[in-house]
C-alpha cells in the first residue's frame, strides 16, 4: 500500500487543521512497519487517521497498546458503507470500512485506524483479544453492516431483535417506514418472537448447574423499576450470589444514526436531544461543533459562553436526578422530591432562555437560535443563590448516612485497568484516580477560559465514590455558571458565515443573494464540504462524541454517535460477578445511564 496523504478539502485549506498529520505516532508507526505500510488520511477530525492492511490490524493495535505512552482505551469501533461515497480520492479502494478509535491518556492524543474491505470478503479479525470492550461494538457493526469479525466469542444481534433480517446501516437498506411492507403481528409471529427471546445458557458458555445443584436464571427487566428503563439483565444465580449475567439491550433503539442520513445538517439537531434525553443542550454541543468544523465556522465569544452556560445547567439537572434516584435505589424516598423541586428551578431558567424544557433543540450551526432574553440573569442569580445550600442538605441528610455508605462502599469496585479496558469515561473513570475530563484535557467552546476543578477519586471506583464525585461536579458546575453570569460577553449570537444556519433573517429583505441563500438553507439545507469531522464533549454521563462524514451534500453520509452509557452497561458483568442481587441494584443506580443513550 502506497503511503499517501490525501486532503479531501485542499481547496479550503485555510480551515484544514493539519496538526494531527504530524502527530509523533505516525513516525513511530512508520519506524516499526515501514514508510509505505499505511495511507494517512487528512481530515477535520483533529485525529490521525491511518488506513492499515487487514492482515496487520492486530499487530498495529498491539504495537500501539505497548508503546511507552500507550493507547490504552478503545474509545469507539464501527463501520461505514463506502459504496456510494464519491469524494474519496487517494483513499484505498473499499466497499466497506471499519474504524478503530484509540485513546492515549498519557499523551492526551487519539488515533483512528481504518481497514478497507471488499463486498465479497467482509471479514476482519476480532479486536476483543486486545480490548475486551470491542465485543459489543463488533456485534453492532456486524448487525448493522454484515461485517464478520473472525474469532468473536458471540457474534449475534445486539440492538435489533434476534429475528431481524438485513443490515440497516447499509446504503441499500430502506430508511423510511413507507419503504417496507405493512407490519402485521400474527399469533405465529408473536410466538416466534417470544421464543427468540428465551435465554439459552449454553449459547453464552454458561452451565445450568453443578453436580450438587442447579443455577437459577432470572430475568431482571426489561420492565423492572431498578433497571432504569427498558433494559434486561439475565442473571445466573447461586442463591443470592450472581455467578454471571448477560445484559440485553436494544429495546429503546430508534435508528438515530440512520436518521442522520435522511435529515439535513440543520434539521437533525432535534434528534440529538433525544440521544440522552436528560442532557438537553449537552447533546447538541458535539454535533454542532462537528458540523462547524466541516463548515469552517468560528463562533463569537458570546455564543461560546451561552453554550457553556446551557450545558452546565443541564449537567446539574441530570446530576440531581441521578443522585436522588441512586439514594432511592438504596431505600430513601425524600431526596427524590427535593431534587424535583431543585430541577424545576433549573427548568425555569432553561425555559425562559430557550422556550423549551427538556429538549430545547436550541443550538444552531454557527450559533444559537436567538439571543438571551431580558431577565435571564435574574433567574440564574436566584438559582445560584439557592442551590449551594441544597447540596449541603443532600450530603447531610442522605449521602453521609451510614446505611447508604454501608450499602455502596466497596460495591461493584474496579480499578484503572478495568475502567480503561471497558471504555469507561466520566465519573466512572475519574473515580479510579485518572484525571481525564474533556473540558480540561481538550477544551471546547471556550472552557479553557473558566476556573473550575475536576474531582478525582483515590484509585478505586465503587458505587459511593462515583456518586460523591457527581456531587462535587455539581459544585464545580455552579462555579462555571457564576462565571457565565458575571462575564457574559457582548456581541452577536450567530457567526457571520455563509453556512451559518439559518442565515441572518434581517438581510433577506435587502439583498437577493441572501434571500436565495436563506431560502435554500432553510428548505433544502446547507451543503457542507466533503470531509470527515469529529467532536467529543464531556457529557452528563461521560464522553459523548459525533463522527460525521460529509460527501458534499445537504445530509450526512455517515453519522456515528458514541455514547458513554453503552460502554458502561457492557462492563456490568465484570463489576458484579460474585456480588449479591441487592448489590447489582445499587450498582445500576450508580452507573448513571438512560437507555436512549445506550440504544440510540
Curated annotation (Swiss-Prot):
Protein keywords: Cell inner membrane, Cell membrane, Membrane, Multifunctional enzyme, NAD, Quinone, Translocase, Transport, Ubiquinone
Membrane topology reported for the UniProt record: Peripheral membrane protein
Subcellular location: Cell inner membrane
Keyword Cell membrane part of the UniProt annotation: yes
A GO molecular function held by the record: NADH dehydrogenase (ubiquinone) activity
UniProt entry tagged with the keyword Nuclease: no
Cysteines paired by S-S bonds: none
GO cellular component, one term: plasma membrane
Main location: membrane
Enzymatic reactions: a quinone + NADH + 5 H(+)(in) = a quinol + NAD(+) + 4 H(+)(out)
Residue segments, region NADH dehydrogenase I subunit D: 214-600
EC number: 7.1.1.-
Region feature NADH dehydrogenase I subunit C, mapped onto this chain: 1-190
PANTHER family with a match to the protein in the record: NADH-QUINONE OXIDOREDUCTASE SUBUNIT C_D, NADH-UBIQUINONE OXIDOREDUCTASE 49 KDA SUBUNIT
Family, similarity comment: In the N-terminal section; belongs to the complex I 30 kDa subunit family. In the C-terminal section; belongs to the complex I 49 kDa subunit family.
Quaternary structure annotation from Swiss-Prot or TrEMBL: NDH-1 is composed of 13 different subunits. Subunits NuoB, CD, E, F, and G constitute the peripheral sector of the complex.
Task performed by this protein: NDH-1 shuttles electrons from NADH, via FMN and iron-sulfur (Fe-S) centers, to quinones in the respiratory chain. The immediate electron acceptor for the enzyme in this species is believed to be ubiquinone. Couples the redox reaction to proton translocation (for every two electrons transferred, four hydrogen ions are translocated across the cytoplasmic membrane), and thus conserves the redox energy in a proton gradient.
NCBIfam families the record matches: NuoC_fam (TIGR01961), NuoD (TIGR01962), PRK06075.1 (NF004739), PRK11742.1 (NF008728)
Protein name, per record: NADH-quinone oxidoreductase subunit C/D
Organism: Citrobacter koseri (strain ATCC BAA-895 / CDC 4225-83 / SGSC4696)
